[in-house]
Swiss-Prot record:
It is found in: Cytoplasm. Its EC number is 6.3.2.8. Gene3D superfamilies: Mur ligase, C-terminal domain, Mur-like, catalytic domain, NAD(P)-binding Rossmann-like Domain. Cell wall formation. ATP binds at G125, T126, H127, G128, K129, T130, T131. It holds the Pfam family Mur_ligase_M. Belongs to the MurCDEF family. One of its GO terms (cellular component) is cytoplasm. Keywords: ATP-binding, Cell cycle, Cell division, Cell shape, Cell wall biogenesis/degradation, Cytoplasm, Ligase, Nucleotide-binding, Peptidoglycan synthesis. It comes from Haemophilus ducreyi (strain 35000HP / ATCC 700724). This is UDP-N-acetylmuramate--L-alanine ligase. It catalyses: UDP-N-acetyl-alpha-D-muramate + L-alanine + ATP = UDP-N-acetyl-alpha-D-muramoyl-L-alanine + ADP + phosphate + H(+).
């Protein structure tokens, strides 16, 4: 008997003319996941990126044709070209595709096609999307449902960020950064929180951003379900506008799935969830912080509403190893001045940084927190400048790297020097600016003390720098 996976192409007859799919920016987390799923479905996949990476090597090994650098001839043979929001309109591959009348579509449009004939779950929100998507993927896997998943980061337990499952279930991270998640039409949607970010997409208007989220949730069928965080005021503000069934979760006393008695020791958190029928579920997590309890409870609420057994839910959450670069321990290292713990974290928004610091304080109360922070994008630094100043003042020692531009031009008074100046003026911590990253290890050895917890924080190339540092320290 043929599996769902064997029949998927027959279920999408409209794509029968599509033979080769080309991805511009294939090394990106969201792009690579979709490319891998389509490759495993049997499509010919090609793609380009400006640098070779572990991701592009993995796709090449799996059978994709990978080009390093963007050239018009790279699209030869393509039936459709998929682009990420990071790619400029004047990219030579996009120009060539348009000249050849080859369709050029957004990443989310292709994800929507993968979703079309599956029972799909989309996870949206400013923070927590990747971890919640990973948790859901592991719960469904533990329950024997073998879901397809497409995540924006590594699912550690699976060793990859995407998987083509044999069942009809699909779990995907929904990207609000360019509002392209409006292409998605899932059966069930999660919204973890809504805060100002990527405001250029929304014309600098937070009200417009809220409206787009409502439209996203109204893409649910009338029998669909919105799972929404009761702790987020903005999420609860838009809930009455959704026009679909809403289930809430959180620490809030009015939440349908309510968290009680959260406690944390080191990396481990444990708490109780009170379900709508007053059933009590005791949850153990090996990822720290109140924010991860929220992520896990969002996943738990979805799974309960979908009829998954408690044993599978609780086992998957207890075994969950985290998502890539989310409070990711790189090891404990002996340095000249003592032994230190090194953590890598992707958080680059003030709220994400705040919850990371809170988790570190709660789990390691007697450690000094040394943060290495690399701001990501000048526009984000400008838009959230005061919030960055306040949150970065909450660590014990702060090392500031230069802004990771991510293709943006510099903005006056939105750089690392300006941040350092304002943080210093606040008087709580005296930041150290390290513009030459080759000196990072030397600077750290001068300031770290025994028992320090070092947080490497940011979404740019700081992870690469920190992992190289860990290799050097291990040697």
């Amino acid at each position: 008997m043929k599996s769902y996976q064997d029949n998927i192409k027959k279920l999408v007859p409209e794509m029968r003319r599509v033979k080769q799919i080309h991805f511009v920016g294939i090394g990106g987390a969201g792009m690579s996941g979709i490319a891998e799923v389509l490759l495993n479905e049997g499509y010919q996949i090609s793609g380009s990126d400006i640098v070779e990476s572990i991701v592009t090597k993995h796709l090449a090994d799996a059978g994709a044709k990978i080009f390093i650098g963007h050239q018009a001839e790279n699209i030869a043979g393509a039936s459709v070209v998929v682009v990420s929001s990071a790619i400029e309109e004047n990219n030579p591959e996009i120009t060539a595709a348009k000249s050849a009348r080859i369709p050029v579509i957004q990443r989310a449009q292709m994800l929507a096609e993968i979703m079309r004939f599956r029972h799909s779950i989309a996870v949206a929100g400013t923070h927590g999307k990747t971890t919640t998507t990973a948790m859901l993927s592991m719960i469904y896997t533990e329950a024997g449902l073998d879901p397809t998943f497409v995540n924006g980061g590594l699912v550690k337990s699976a060793g990859k960020n995407a998987h083509l499952g044999a069942s009809r279930y699909l779990i995907a991270e929904a990207d609000e950064s360019d509002a392209s998640f409006l292409h998605l039409q899932p059966m069930l949607s999660v919204v973890t929180n809504i805060e100002p970010d990527h405001m250029d997409t929304y014309g600098g208007d937070f009200e417009q951003m809220k409206t787009i989220y409502v439209k996203f949730l109204r893409n649910l069928p009338f029998y669909g379900l919105a799972v929404m965080c009761a702790d987020d005021d903005v999420v609860m503000e838009i809930a009455p506008q959704v026009g679909r069934q809403v289930i809430s979760y959180g620490f809030n006393a009015n939440a349908d799935y309510r968290i009680e008695n959260y406690q944390q020791t080191g990396f481990q958190g444990h708490y109780t969830v009170i379900c709508p029928n007053n059933e009590r579920l005791d949850v153990v997590l090996n990822v720290p912080g109140h924010h991860n309890a929220l992520n896990a409870t969002a996943a738990l609420a979805v799974a309960k509403e979908e009829g998954i057994a408690n044993d599978a839910i609780l086992a998957a959450l207890a075994d969950f190893q985290g998502a890539g670069r989310r409070f990711d321990p790189l090891g404990t290292f002996k340095r000249p001045n003592g032994t230190v713990m090194l953590i890598d974290d992707y958080g680059h928004h003030p709220t994400e940084i705040a919850v990371t610091i809170k988790a570190a304080r709660q789990g390691w109360q007697h450690k000094r927190i040394v943060m290495i922070f690399q701001p990501h994008r000048y526009s984000r630094t400008r838009d959230l400048f005061d919030d960055f100043v306040n949150v970065l003042s909450k660590v014990d020692v702060l090392i500031m790297l230069d802004v990771y531009a991510a293709g943006e031009n510099a903005i006056v008074k939105a750089d690392s020097k300006a941040l350092c100046r304002s943080i210093r003026n606040l008087g709580k911590v005296d930041p150290i600016l390290v513009s030459d990253t080759s000196q990072l290890g030397e600077v750290l050895d001068q300031i770290i003390q025994d028992n320090d917890l070092i947080l490497a924080q940011g979404a740019g190339n700081i992870s690469k720098l920190t992992r190289k540092l860990a290799e050097d320290w291990q040697a």
